[in-house]
Amino acid sequence: MSKKLYIKTYGCQMNVYDSVKMQDLLYPFGYESTENIKEADVIILNTCHIREKAAEKIYSELGRIKKLQDTRKKHGLSSAIIVVAGCVAQAEGEEIFTRTPYVDIVVGPQSYYNLPELISKVVRHEKHLIDLDFVEEAKFDQLPEQLYPQGASAFISVQEGCDKFCTFCVVPYTRGVEFSRNVEQVYREALKVVSNGAREIMLLGQNVNAYHGKGVDDKIFSLADLIRYLAQIPNLERLRYTTSHPIDMTDDLIKLHSIESKLMPFVHLPVQSGSNKILKAMNRKHDREYYFNIINRLREARPDIVLSSDFIVGFPGETDEDFEDTLDLVRKIKYGQCYSFKYSPRPGTPGATRTDQIPEHIKSERLTILQKELSSQQLAFNESCVGSTMKVLFDRSGKFDGQIIGKTPYMQSVYINNTNQDLLCKIIDVKITKATSNSLTGEIYT
């Protein structure tokens, strides 16, 4: 009889990838995935530590799981094994056992490949097992081949960690320094996901364009080199990468956007602020002029390229003038889509120790203003697509009968009404008939 595995994933695409790999790790040991937490034999919370109160949200979720455990005991059922994985696990460590002693395992993002052994020990009645080692090479060497198909679009992690040490960010402390996977390891995984039906691959990294993996004869591959290599795979039709840092956006990578047809015309390039003063305080290692130059060169290389970014408002010391600089940058660049957040102090980061924190109400006001501008830009871009025919990769069914959802080359979600499920995992010409700020509606072009 198979055992049931429930995984709840928080945060970034890297965590989504890690959760898939956890499924693959545990499948040979008899664990099948379930979306019903009540029937799970193992419950894994794969956590994120980027946003404010991330740890408290996990403790709240663990409290709900404790009530579920108590109910199971009342009915004479065995308790599930509870695992806290990911970046909150790395940051909190033993504190998780102190606050929630019913948790069985705490495992960091670089050591979850040990989950089968850790779970086996809990089955043998060992308690409070923790593994927070930072050995990236071991992680990637131990990860299994893909067992669970990811669908039309697949994530592949090629780089982890970050050496930039932005003053607002916990990634270097929870994911470690930059490490790049071996080229052939990535290539084999790409072959596997394509053989399982993927037509698009998203290459993932906390700082993906800093990729410098070893290939044959120890040749070092840049991200551009890796993309060129993967583009040779038959039946792979689209390649993407995220997330990038402006200072690692090389001439070679920019030029590749003009010549590699499989590389999609969409770049997520976080800038965080439009103020040179705030960029310096954030330790971003570039100024707004440098960022503008990168954007201009990308648009010269690929005139139809669409840009996305991340913004943080209310970083310590941010004045009204600094915020206006951010709005000015946004208006000049004109993004296709963006993510924006209020600054939240992360324990252990330099930004958290500053005494010139911005009041919450000011951060909220600025975020509202920025999001209004970004939403307006996103709507304008989507509306500009109405009447055009776009190539859409259909990757999933919608909530309603006969509804299918896909993605354009520019990462827009497209909804069509069509009962033909054979469209899934195919790229089809779609005429766009309607746009909102968040999605497009269309019909098959005939």
UniProtKB/Swiss-Prot annotation:
Q: Which UniProt keywords apply?
A: 4Fe-4S, Cytoplasm, Iron, Iron-sulfur, Metal-binding, S-adenosyl-L-methionine, Transferase, tRNA processing
Taking every annotated instance into account, which residue ranges of this chain make up the domain MTTase N-terminal? 3-124
EC number(s) per entry: 2.8.4.3
The organism's superkingdom is given as Bacteria
Residue ranges occupied by any Radical SAM core domain in the UniProt entry = 148-380
| Cofactor: binding comment | Binds 2 [4Fe-4S] clusters. One cluster is coordinated with 3 cysteines and an exchangeable S-adenosyl-L-methionine.
Listed binding positions for [4Fe-4S] cluster 2 are: 162, 166, 169
Q: Which Gene3D superfamilies match?
A: Methylthiotransferase, N-terminal domain, tm_1862 like domain
The GO molecular function terms of this record are: 4 iron, 4 sulfur cluster binding; metal ion binding; N6-isopentenyladenosine methylthiotransferase activity
Spans traversing the lipid bilayer: none
Where in or outside the cell it occurs: the entry states: Cytoplasm
Against InterPro entries, the record matches this protein to: Elp3/MiaA/NifB-like_rSAM, Methylthiotransferase, Methylthiotransferase_CS, Methylthiotransferase_N, Methylthiotransferase_N_sf, MiaB_methiolase, rSAM, rSAM_horseshoe
Signal sequence range: none
Could you name the Gene Ontology cellular component terms for this entry? cytosol
Q: Which cofactor does it need?
A: [4Fe-4S] cluster
> Which residues form each disulfide bond in the chain?
none
Task: Please list the residue ranges annotated as the TRAM domain.
Answer: 383-446
Query: Which SUPFAM superfamilies does the record match to this protein?
Result: Radical SAM enzymes
- Enumerate the SMART domains for this protein: Elp3 (SM00729)
Q: What does this protein's UniProt record list under function?
A: Catalyzes the methylthiolation of N6-(dimethylallyl)adenosine (i(6)A), leading to the formation of 2-methylthio-N6-(dimethylallyl)adenosine (ms(2)i(6)A) at position 37 in tRNAs that read codons beginning with uridine.
What assembly does the database describe for this protein?
A: Monomer.
Please name the NCBIfam families in this protein's record: miaB-methiolase (TIGR01574), MiaB/RimO family radical SAM methylthiotransferase (TIGR00089)
Task: Give the family per the record.
Answer: Belongs to the methylthiotransferase family. MiaB subfamily.
This protein is called tRNA-2-methylthio-N(6)-dimethylallyladenosine synthase
Species the sequence originates in: Rickettsia canadensis (strain McKiel)
